[in-house]
Amino acid sequence: LRNKRNGLRSLLTGIENGLAIENDISNVQHFANRGITYITLCHNGDNQICDSARHSLNTHGGVSPFGAQVIAEMNRLGLMVDLSHAGEKSFYDALQISRTPIVCSHSNSRALCDVPRNITDEQMRALAAAGGVCQITLYNGFLRTDGNATITDAIRHLEHAIDIMGIEHVGLGADFDGDGGIPGLADASELVNFTKALLRRRYSETDMSLIWGGNWLRVMNLCQQSAQR
């Protein structure tokens, strides 16, 4: 926020797939020392930390014992736990294990688009109850099962999440580096179109600041403050 006030842009770095930790818990500290702010526990397939929402063999039945250690170490170091890509059992296990709020950096509503990678209304409620954030993603196949998504579909997913979780627990996680992008929101240069769509729906400046990173920064700050205690 200080950088923004000074006219500077900031980038937050993360790791998508805890596979990078290998089987060495000290690697969590290694990555934290290099400025990582969050780790997505898994990707498309089970790893040593937890079972995935896609291509899962139910390897651990949720979060593994090593995965529980990883989450505890992330809590200790002030890193956000990201449950996008995690299977449903892994999701609830991680919520129970973590002593700080959790994020889903790029996940949509399964009620609107019934694919395993999206999260259910029950998961959304549990995430909000734990103080976490779900960020809507712009990946076609997670917005509509036919893959023909528009900005209207992205807004539908956002507003469904707001209805279930509250405005304090949502955001946008475009996933432009992972096949995200739809007509009118193809890349970062077109994100202003999302803001315009929110303005047409009479969202306040305060609400838009929460959607556009305020909620994410709240969780990040809580995690970092918890690590300092």
Model regions and ranges:
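Active-site beta-loop-alpha junctions enriched in small/polar residues
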Residues: 14-18, 44-46, 79, 84-91, ...
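Short acidic/histidine-rich active-site segments
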Residues: 137-138, 165-188
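Non-cysteine beta-strand/loop elements that form the S-adenosyl-L-methionine
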Residues: 37-44, 105, 130-136, 170-172
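Conserved, mostly hydrophobic/aromatic
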Residues: 35, 81, 106, 134, ...
